Amino acid sequence: LSLHGIILKSRETDKTFGFDDTYVDLARALRQPSRQGRNYREFADARKNLRTIIDGRVQIDDESGRWSFRKGNQKFAIGVTAEGVKKIAILDTLLSNRHLDTRSIIFIDEPESALHPKAISEFMNIIMILAQSGIQFFLASHSYFVIKKLFLLSQQHAMSIPVLSAEGQEWKSNDLIKGMPNNSIIDESISLYEEEVE
């Protein structure tokens, strides 16, 4: 969010190609205004839950083009706002301006990054709500919390969640509906727990 203006200026004004198209596309999508009116029920529920996690909202000032985080009557520059808040705010913005629909595909690298465990769990709940509406998610994670929460959601909703795990030069596929996969992240988490219990 803090590079939003620079990304757009480099491509649209300066005509340089310093940023990958995915960043340019995201910056363009984020500058679209929120739309009023009825939205998919799942999207409205997800937005409500997203705002609960960050206890506020992110908005852009139309005149300055700068992003800020609003929490109650307080306003903070986006540069001093936590990275986890920014990540969640991006998803909220894309839902509010209707850039996302039930056929969208979202890639999130390390969704756990800069979020405390309770927020990670809530974020996974939101991803499940959106996935049930039709949005397809691809997540890359090194977090036991993420894997375990997705496993629990898969069991609770009887929903297939395919998982690919790298083991050396090989890839192993599993489905969380069938159980937790064996991989180094899970093995190390269990090992630490067992070490503490002993």
Q: Which sequence ranges carry the predicted segments?
A:
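Phosphate-coordinating catalytic segments in nucleotide- and nucleic-acid-processing enzymes
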Residues: 1-103, 159, 169-198
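Walker B motif beta-strand of ABC-family P-loop ATPases
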Residues: 105-107
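Walker B catalytic acidic pair
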Residues: 109-111
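Surface-exposed loop-to-helix/strand elements on domain peripheries
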Residues: 113-114, 124
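C-terminal lobe/lid and adjacent interdomain/linker elements of RecA-like ASCE P-loop ATPase modules
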Residues: 122-198
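Short N-terminal micro-motifs specific to bacterial/archaeal maturation
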Residues: 72, 79, 114, 137-138
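Short, contiguous clusters of charged residues that form electrostatic/catalytic patches at enzyme active sites
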Residues: 86-89, 121, 125
